[in-house]
A protein has these predicted regions:
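Residue-level recognition of strand-loop junctions within catalytic nucleotide-signaling folds
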Residues: 9, 38, 84-85, 122-124
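Residues that form or flank phosphate/diphosphate-binding pockets in enzymes
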Residues: 24, 41, 89, 114, ...
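PLP-dependent aminotransferase class I/II
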Residues: 1-64, 70-72
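PLP-dependent enzyme catalytic core of the Aspartate aminotransferase-like
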Residues: 96-101, 106, 110-142
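Conserved PLP-binding catalytic core of the aspartate aminotransferase-like
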Residues: 50-51, 55, 64-101, 117, ...
């Protein structure tokens, strides 16, 4: 389940409403979101795990730095990876590799960031799988 929310000036909300997906959050999803906000223990655990796994994935990207990758510092539940503009290791190539291996990330070419991938922080298994797949891509492309 994925829940999102925004607090903004009315013109910004109107702009967001024009580009959002066609389906709003279900009533069940809304109830689950409200209940999760009341569970401080769970929120703290998720926050700690997200910070820990983000640091792990950033470290894995740093270890691949000799291939020209750079993790953009983040305080979010994702990291932004910048790839070289050209050469054997690119964002487009990594995106295709990850998709071919069942991993969906966000290739940001449409947002005018063709050298970048946005990768969400998931579970420990998911995060380690992404790190291993990126390492395999870089090692195979070099």
């Amino acid at each position: 389940m994925r829940i999102g929310w925004a607090v903004a000036a009315l013109p910004i909300i109107a702009a967001l409403d024009r580009v959002r997906g066609p389906f709003n959050v279900t009533t069940t999803g809304q109830a689950a979101a409200v209940a999760s906000l009341a569970d401080d223990t769970h929120l703290d655990m998720v926050r700690r795990e997200t910070i820990r796994l983000r640091a792990f994935l950033e470290g894995e990207i740093v270890a691949l730095g000799n291939a020209g990758l750079r993790a953009i510092p983040s305080a979010c539940n994702f990291i932004l990876i910048e790839f070289p503009e050209s050469g054997p290791v690119t964002a487009a190539g990594a995106n295709k590799w990850l998709l071919d291996h069942g991993i969906i990330c966000r290739y940001l070419a449409v947002q005018n960031m063709p050298r970048c991938l946005r990768i969400s922080i998931g579970t420990e298994t998911e995060t380690r799988t992404v790190a291993a797949a990126l390492r395999d891509y870089v090692e195979g492309a070099a």
